[in-house]
Amino acid sequence: MLNILQDFSDLSQKRLDALMADYIVRTKALESYILGLTNLTWQTLMQPYLDYTDGFAFKSITLMKDLHPDKTVRNNVANFHSDFINQIQLLHNNDVRTVFKRYATTQYLVEESTLTPEQVNFFNKHSDFLSWVDDGKFDMDGMNKLSIEINTLNCKINEHYMTSYPNTQFTQEELDYGSSNISYIKKRHIRKIVREEWQDHKSAMIPTMERVAFAKQEQATLQGFAQHSDVALYGTMIKTTQALNTFLDKAHIMLKPYIDRDMSILRDYAKADGIDELQDYDIPYYLRIHKDKLTQLSLNCEKKYFPYHRTVQNILHLFEVFLGYTFTEIHNKKLVWHKSVRLLEVKENDTTKGYVYLDIVQRHGKQSDRFYHVAVVEKSLHTLPVSIVDCSFDGGYFSFSNIKTLFHELGHAMHNISSTATISLMSSVFCETDFIEAPSQFFEYWCCSPTILKCISPGIPDDIITGILKNAKLMKGYVWGLDLVNCKMDMAFHSKEFKGYSYALAYNIYDKILGGGLSDKNLYVECQPMFSGYDVQYYRYMYSLSIAFELLSVFEGRELDPVLGKRFRDEVLSQGALRPSLESVVKFLGREPDMTAFLKIVQ
């Protein structure tokens, strides 16, 4: 078993240089080995390649560009990460691909019947990438140059968002609740300033974002695709740009009555304050006012039932009971990057399944609105899964929204931990990208029941639970409408019709779905995830949510059934790319999924 837990006590430039040098040496050694092969079999060609991909279990170190408290380390690791991504291109050159193609067209056909289903599925899924050869009609050098440019620009975009923030200081008189959270700012002109500062901050990256979009389109053209969205959807459940646009249009038709209802409610609040035209910077404030009014449950009243340490422990215990795991904390200062980070060993009976890092408290060196899960190591013959759950909670008390977020991100971690793959590229997190959110959304909504809430906070009054769950369901029309705006913006960015970003582009999409109110300084630059590997991926939250609700419907009245929980683990969480996700869902449900559960929630 490879060493999968990294030493974070030394992230000096010297160590990073040594890691990069080792990576380059091993890459060149594998290239030389492959080019010298005369006997091409799975064991001589494919297995060494897979072992090589498993041998770089330092992805957790690259995450330190976002998580380490030392700014110098963050910057050094950001450069290391960029170099690492660019170096990946070196192994997949034409000479190496020629060897893979020779194997694919000769010996693989002979030995296919002797390979495991996992090996066959892997080869079918990745053989095009591994064995594609430049026949002289394709500009491989151009593709590689564009990939390097895209990666470099994406790193620049992310660095801008991670290291630079608006910093206007307001007086206590200007901030009604002492918070710069826009949903708590009563004075409209202050709300506008706060929103426009963030938009100015984000807009600084628009030319860079445009260049990334154009470079991706150039790559798509080189590959023979009409647009980048066609490339990005290859191998997904939804498959094509046309199918995705059809799904979004149908979703809009289905959701429009609820979007219009919620926007009308918000406009009425604004009119009561003398505001004739609701603007985007007004919405968070009136959204909170409406929820507080209907639930009569203040945030502070809600939060007092969820003290940080007790809540985290109770949530972890719920996952233990439901999935049949145990979590044990490992105390080793070298294995964490900050004293607030917890490292958990996950076991099933006495067998270690993997490890989960919890870096979930806001602190110096972390972006204030980060809520992520990253699988830094995937399951294989030589590795166990390692996940990092990265959130920015205040460490005092949880809101219910915080709790849902933690369930969601822990759901991703359990998806990774539960993998039974022997090839890392077939592990749970390599399922179709438009299914990967379904398990985490399952857990996010699993906690939306009185049974689970009473386990999280024993003794919580029933009327508080009623208020919390009512609050969680309010204004879903607006929330899904905003999701549709993001989906449409994502598709616009990555379509062949994209000519550049503009207020007109943003307004037309925003107005069609939410009915106007996009302020003239707001280019709606909420698309940074598009430049972090999420391009043409916004739709997957809504698409996978319909599947998550189907899975969740089986647990109605049986939320803590451990037998059912373990069957969910084995049939859904553990499978990953070992079989099509639809097959896993059908095996668990005992039927084809439909939109029944989703429509029930919407209505």
PLM regions: where:
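N-terminal helix-rich structural modules
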Residues: 1-178, 182
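C-terminal, non-catalytic "cap/extension" segments appended to globular domains
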Residues: 2-22, 28, 34-36, 124-127, ...
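Membrane-entry segments of alpha-helical transmembrane domains in multi-pass membrane proteins
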Residues: 8-19, 42-46, 204-205, 244-251, ...
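Membrane-interfacial helix termini and the short, flexible loops that connect transmembrane helices
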Residues: 34-38, 64-72, 193-203, 231, ...
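Long, well-ordered alpha-helical segments
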Residues: 60, 225, 411-421, 449-454
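Active-site-proximal, well-structured secondary-structure segments within enzyme catalytic domains
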Residues: 118-131, 148-189, 210-392, 436, ...
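A conserved hydrophobic secondary-structure block that centers on an alpha-helix together
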Residues: 136-137, 141, 200-211, 218, ...
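Short pre-active-site segment immediately N-terminal to the catalytic Zn-binding motif
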Residues: 393-407
